[in-house]
């Protein structure tokens, strides 16, 4: 078994057994998920059939179904979705599935969306291909999550430490580490920006620190530049490279669509 397959199995086992990590997901309340839901709802036609990947505790799927859509929420962990049964209805169902091997037929959904999933998969290109496969022609793909390549994360950490706070676990635990992370992210993002092809960078998940949050368990060094280039290369049309709801988010997205803190790519299958 190669290293990436081993890491994939370790991640599955971790997500099936970690009570502490489940508590982090359960803290994702309506307020936390509202921006994601609003962005998906903005592009979904009335009564769309939606696939919500990596839905964790299932709440985001429930919120989308409340808007009149038919929603299937999925997660790799039965443990995470254990409480979702009480949310199910005629327009909402859940299933356990791996984003790298979705149990759905080609062109099944009007919308395929994910929030804070892509950085956790061990093969991001394959996950994106699976999303495109089950998406209908003309359908909407929305991929959201942290831009781990953003140089602005280190700025936030340096400000926090200057005020007496702590840095980010794994990524920027000291000022020196934060400065190095910011510089590396800037040079990496610039390299990606001017590269002809997507360059998906794998990283080894740090599961010992995953219970502290901060995407220590990420397996892909996520960047919107990779996703943009890959989707375009596979016939998708980018509608929004950095979609946002708030005024601050829209300004950030307009000024730094590929370098901001978050990924919020919206594309259409042509």
Could you describe each region identified by the protein language model?
Residues 125-130, 140-264:
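S-adenosyl-L-methionine-dependent methyltransferase catalytic module, highlighting the catalytic core
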Residues 267-270:
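Active-site beta-strand termini and strand-to-loop segments that position acidic
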Residues 121-122, 135-136:
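Helix-to-beta-strand junctions that scaffold the AdoMet/dcAdoMet cofactor pocket
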Residues 1-100, 111-113, 220, 260-263:
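Conserved N-terminal segment of class I S-adenosyl-L-methionine
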Residues 116-120:
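Short catalytic micro-motifs in class I SAM-dependent methyltransferases
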Residues 101-106:
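Short conserved loop adjoining the S-adenosyl-L-methionine
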Residues 49, 139-140:
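Short glycine-centered segments of the SAM/dcSAM-binding site in methyltransferase folds
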Residues 68, 91, 138, 235-238:
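A generic structural signal for alpha->beta connector loops
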């Amino acid at each position: 078994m190669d290293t990436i397959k081993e890491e994939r199995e370790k991640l599955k086992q971790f997500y099936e057994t970690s009570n502490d990590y489940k508590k982090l997901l359960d803290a994702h309340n309506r307020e936390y998920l509202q921006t994601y839901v609003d962005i998906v709802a903005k592009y979904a036609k009335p009564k769309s059939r939606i696939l919500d990947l990596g839905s964790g505790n299932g709440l985001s799927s429930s919120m989308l179904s409340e808007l009149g859509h038919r929603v299937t929420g999925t997660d790799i962990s039965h443990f995470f979705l254990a409480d979702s049964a009480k949310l199910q209805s005629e327009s909402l169902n859940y299933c356990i599935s791996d984003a790298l091997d979705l149990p759905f037929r080609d062109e099944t959904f009007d919308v395929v969306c994910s929030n804070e999933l892509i950085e956790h998969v061990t093969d991001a290109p394959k996950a994106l291909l699976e999303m495109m496969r089950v998406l209908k022609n003309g359908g909407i793909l929305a991929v959201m999550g942290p831009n781990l390549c953003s140089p602005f994360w280190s700025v936030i950490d340096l400000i926090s430490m200057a005020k007496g706070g702590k840095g980010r676990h794994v990524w920027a635990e000291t000022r020196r580490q934060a400065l190095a992370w910011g510089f590396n992210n800037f040079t990496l993002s610039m390299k990606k920006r001017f590269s002809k092809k997507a360059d998906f960078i794998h990283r080894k998940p740090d599961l010992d620190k995953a219970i502290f949050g901060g995407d220590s368990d990420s397996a892909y060094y996520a960047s919107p530049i990779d996703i943009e280039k890959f989707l375009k290369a596979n016939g998708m049309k980018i509608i929004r490279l950095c979609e946002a709801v708030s005024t601050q988010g829209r300004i950030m997205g307009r000024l730094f669509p590929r370098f901001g803190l978050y990924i919020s790519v919206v594309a259409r299958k042509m």
